[in-house]
Amino acid sequence: MKTKNSKEQLTPDNMESQSLEVSMLNKDNFSDKELESYLSKGEIKATDKITIPPKILFVGDCTIATFGNFSASTGKAKSKKTFNISAMVAAAVTNTTVLNYRADLPEGKRKILYFDTEQSKFHCHNVLERIYKLSGLSLQKDDCRLLFWGLREYTPKLRIALIDYALRKHDEVGLVIIDGLRDLMYDINNGKEATDVMTVLMAWTSVYELHIHTAVSYTHLRAHETKANL
């Protein structure tokens, strides 16, 4: 698989169909060689020099996002979660303060990928316009620091594959938005599916050294928590 540091430009013709992180979800058996490789990769030694992950988003003096982690906006349906995310993204695009959010993405990690899994193209475009207006960007020119996709018409499995592909294709990504996390699953009450999606999120944040922010409704959170407590 071509890595993010490869000099050759990644295209659909020279890329593998999925990353190692996603392909692992479909495997039940691992060879000793694979297990040794994964175990070695995960080993942490006292002599390792591990730097503090960059803090990239703040509300006042409180850090709300760092590289290598993911977070979520939660609330009832139609509770302005998307507006909250719009303000966050607007701050991140310009590395300034927008409403209550302040952003400080490092150079070389300024690109933002936004995936909406629920809304129509019309409503997705409204969200994108709102971000541009909040950040003071001109609507007459596309800003290459922010890429936006609507994935409403695709299956959960294809949505995961498309996000995975975008992460492998685009360099210098510091922030990923997934508005509609539950749409990466067929059944929100399926414990294995929920664990698999969380595992992929953790892998993406670690492998690509970025932050993922998602939107989740209380209804979906309660459904999964009820299932987990049975």
Name each region found by the language model.
Residues 1-31:
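Short, small/acidic-rich helices and loops at N termini and domain boundaries
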Residues 23-130:
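The Walker A/P-loop phosphate-binding site
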Residues 64, 166-167, 204:
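A general structural signal for stabilizing positions within well-ordered secondary structure
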Residues 106-192, 196:
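Conserved inter-motif catalytic segment of the P-loop NTP-binding fold
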Residues 176-179, 211-216:
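Short beta-strand segments at enzyme active-site cores
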Residues 196-214:
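Substrate-engagement module of ASCE P-loop NTPases
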Residues 219-228:
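Conserved small/polar residues in nucleotide/adenosyl-binding loops
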